[in-house]
């Protein structure tokens, strides 16, 4: 059995380590908290813990997604709720964008071979629980990339030919 003084010293050392650990963990937790509007780069807008940026320089879907990946955890935007869709619609309309379509991260890598539109997914691998098609995509159209359409107020999705050059929205960590 250890002497009482050794147990007391070890108890204080353990307590000191635990206190230091809680301070360090608290600092990490603060960094992971949802971002404030000021932490997004100029020209982008915050929503939740992400920054969103509309780029008016047109690119095809693949090049647009690659451009978005240059940002922290960035991809073409995934639209995961009606509230996020409304935020995006407002952002795009207030930008003065004059195009009919804007690229989002939706695509069908199966090229329509998966039945019942089952091949559609987000480029960042987010789960597709929210569905908001303007018109159901056709497996035979050759259009396998997703856009937001002006006709729907930039609220609903429409399939388009992936090589079209369009403006695009990136979603990335603040």
From Swiss-Prot:
One of its GO terms (molecular function) is hormone activity. The gene is Reg3g. Predominantly expressed in the small intestine, including Paneth cells (at protein level). Hardly detectable in the colon (at protein level). Highly expressed in the lung epithelium during methicillin-resistant S.aureus infection and allergic airway inflammation (at protein level). Skin injury increases its epidermal expression. Also expressed in the pancreas. Expressed by nocireceptors. Disruption phenotype: Mutant mice are born at normal Mendelian ratios. They appear healthy and show no signs of enteropathy, but exhibit marked increase in the number of mucosa-associated bacteria, predominantly Gram-positive, relative to cohoused wild-type littermates in distal small intestine. Nociceptor-specific deficient mice exhibit high mortality rates in response to endotoxin accompanied by increased kynurenine pathway and impaired ATP production in the brain. It is found in: Secreted; Cytoplasm. GO terms for cellular component: collagen-containing extracellular matrix; extracellular space; secretory granule. Zn(2+) binds at residues 107, 121, 144. It comes from Mus musculus. GO terms for biological process: acute-phase response; antimicrobial humoral immune response mediated by antimicrobial peptide; defense response to Gram-negative bacterium; defense response to Gram-positive bacterium; MyD88-dependent toll-like receptor signaling pathway; negative regulation of inflammatory response; negative regulation of inflammatory response to wounding; negative regulation of keratinocyte differentiation. Disulfide bonds join 40-51, 68-170, 145-162. It comes from the Eukaryota. Residues 47-171 form the C-type lectin domain. Proteolytic processing by trypsin removes an inhibitory N-terminal propeptide and is essential for peptidoglycan binding and antibacterial activity. The EPN motif is essential for recognition of the peptidoglycan carbohydrate backbone and for efficient bacterial killing with Glu-114 playing a key role in peptidoglycan binding and bactericidal activity. This is Regenerating islet-derived protein 3-gamma.
